[in-house]
Amino acid sequence: MSEFVVGANLPWLDYGQDFGKSAWQPRGGLSRPERRERLRRALGELAASGASLVRWWLLGDGRAGLSEDGEGRIAGLDDRLLPDVDAAIEGLREAGLRVLFVLVDFLWLDMLRQVGGARLGGRRDHVRDPSLRARLLERVVAPIAERYGLEPAVAGWDLMNEPEWATLGVGTLDPRRSVSRREMRAFLADTASVVHARARQPLSVGLASARSLSLVEGLDLDLLQVHWYESLDPVTALARPVESLGVGRPLLLGEFPTRGASLSPRSILDMAREAGYSGALAWSAQAADHATDAQACHHVLRDWCGRLAPAPREA
C-alpha cells in the first residue's frame, strides 16, 4: 500500500452470521436474496462515500459457517460458507471495493455459550492445542485461502482481530478465555504459514494498540496493523511517527473511532497520514457500539475524498 488508503470497517451486516449456517439462520447468510440486497446497499453507500477498502469479519466468534464432529471438534466448513463468501466477492466487485477479511475475532476464545442452539466462542482449544490447531487450519483456513488467494477483490487477510484481549498477561488476566503469549504467537505463526502457502495477498494482525506490536514481532506478516482508541492510548501515541517505531513494514491504522474521541474523525485521518501510516479505516459503517457513528463514518470519507456537497452560498 504505497498511497494513503482510506476506507472503513464494515465490519459485518450481522456479527458472525454473514458467512455460513447457524441455528439462527439454517439457510446460510449473504447468498440469500434478501441479504444480497442489504449487502448491495451497504457496499454501494461506502463506495459512493469514497471508500476503497473495507475490513470485514469472516468467522467472528465461530457461531456460523462451521461443521463439527460428535465430540465438538471442528470438522470443516459448512456447505453455505463459501457460497456466502462468493456473494460477498460479487458485491465487492459490483461496488468497486476491495476487502481486508478478518479470519477470526478474539471472541473465538471466549467461554462457550449456547444461545438458541448456536455455539458462541468456546474455541480456545483450537488455538492452544497443536493438533486441534492443525485441524482448524487444514479444514477451515486452508480451503478459504485456496479459493480466494488470487481474488483481486481481496486486498489482504487479517489473521485475528485484537488478539491481546485473548492473550494472558497482555490484554486479560482471565485464563478461562485466553491463551499464553507463546500459544497465541504459535497460532498466528501457523496461520500465517498456511495462508501464505495458498494466497498472494498480504497478511496482517489487527492489534488493539501499538503498545502490543511485540506480540507479532518476528512473525511472517507483510503489513502491520494497529488500532487507536483514546480509552487505550493518548493522542500522542497516534501522532508518533511510524518511522520511530522501527517496524520496518507498512503500518495500517485498522480502526479509529467515529464517535467518542476528543479528535474529529477528519483530524484523526490527518494525523495518521502525517505520522506515516499507510492508510486508515474508520470504525464503523454498520456496528452498533459506543465508538460508531455511521453518519460520521460516511461523512469523513466524503470529506476526505472531496465528495461533500458544497455549502450553500450566502445571499
Describe the function of each predicted region.
Residues 39, 85, 237-238, 265:
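Amphipathic coiled-coil/heptad-repeat helices and related helical stalk/stem segments
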Residues 63, 232-233, 289:
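Short glycine-rich, flexible loops that bind phosphorylated cofactors or substrates
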Residues 202, 249-250:
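Short, proline-centered helix/strand-breaking motifs
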Residues 232-240:
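Substrate-binding surface in catalytic domains of secreted glycosidases
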Residues 1-221, 227, 260, 275, ...:
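Active-site mouth of glycoside hydrolases
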Residues 6, 55, 250-315:
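Substrate-binding cleft of secreted/luminal carbohydrate-active enzymes
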Residues 213-218, 239-245, 268-274:
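Mature extracellular/periplasmic domains of secretome proteins
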Residues 35, 240, 310-314:
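Hydrophobic alpha-helical segments, principally membrane-spanning helices and signal/leader peptides
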